[in-house]
């Protein structure tokens, strides 16, 4: 995985799960004119939606014509069913990519966290980033980190941490509405049709959350604004 990057001109990383928020993060990177590399965590041992998530992540990468690297050998344990630290898992794989490709200047890591979960992601990222900085300087703790390694370290970007899911959908609808057709948001018993097309259950909390957010966005996007601009 580390040495399988074909495009050596990439300058940022996007963790692409196949869901809405990560797809929006990829949209943001492309809209900014950056050259993203996408990373997908493939965990069939603990995630029953691993196949549709990977399939939709690939669809999203193809949609934006970017490279997708799949990590199926994460350095973190995969057996536990109570893995509440997916961000740490992603950061571990990201660190492997950065450390294993010193010729690539990764400037940004773009996260799709929204207003509901950005705080949790920031907390989980704090210490892995400290460890990464210390490791690049071959130090046991951060006081000895070289200034150049702080300057060279990629910045974590949270472009949607002040937006709710329906607001992200509204934004995407105005620019790339077809992107919403290749988003996977289901944690229930999905169906498979025609060998590839994955059909969400429509009943689980993830399905209900996504459908409600789309409904809210649709009702709000074109409503008449009251008052007038001065």
Where are these regions (language model features)?
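Nucleotide-activated chemistry modules centered on ATP-dependent adenylation/adenylyltransferase
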Residues: 2-230
């Amino acid at each position: 995985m580390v040495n399988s990057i074909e495009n050596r001109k990439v300058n940022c990383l996007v963790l692409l799960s196949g869901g809405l928020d990560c797809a929006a993060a990829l949209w943001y990177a492309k809209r900014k004119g950056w050259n993203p590399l996408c990373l997908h965590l493939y965990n069939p041992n603990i995630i029953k939606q691993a196949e549709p998530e990977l399939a939709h992540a690939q669809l999203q990468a193809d949609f934006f014509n970017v490279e997708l690297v799949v990590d199926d050998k994460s350095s973190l344990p995969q057996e536990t069913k109570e893995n509440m630290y997916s961000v740490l898992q992603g950061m571990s794989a990201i660190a492997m990519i950065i450390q294993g490709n010193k010729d690539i200047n990764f400037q940004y890591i773009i996260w799709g966290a929204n207003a509901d979960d950005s705080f949790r992601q920031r907390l989980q990222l704090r210490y892995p980033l400290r460890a990464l900085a210390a490791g690049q300087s071959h130090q046991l703790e951060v006081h000895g980190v070289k200034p150049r390694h702080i300057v060279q370290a990629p910045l974590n970007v949270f472009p949607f941490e002040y937006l709710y899911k329906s607001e992200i959908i509204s934004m995407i609808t105005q620019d790339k509405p077809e992107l919403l057709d290749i988003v996977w948001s289901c944690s229930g018993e999905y169906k498979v049709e025609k060998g590839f097309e994955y059909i969400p259950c429509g009943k689980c909390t993830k399905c209900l959350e996504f459908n409600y957010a789309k409904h809210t966005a649709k009702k709000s996007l074109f409503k008449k604004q009251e008052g007038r601009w001065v």
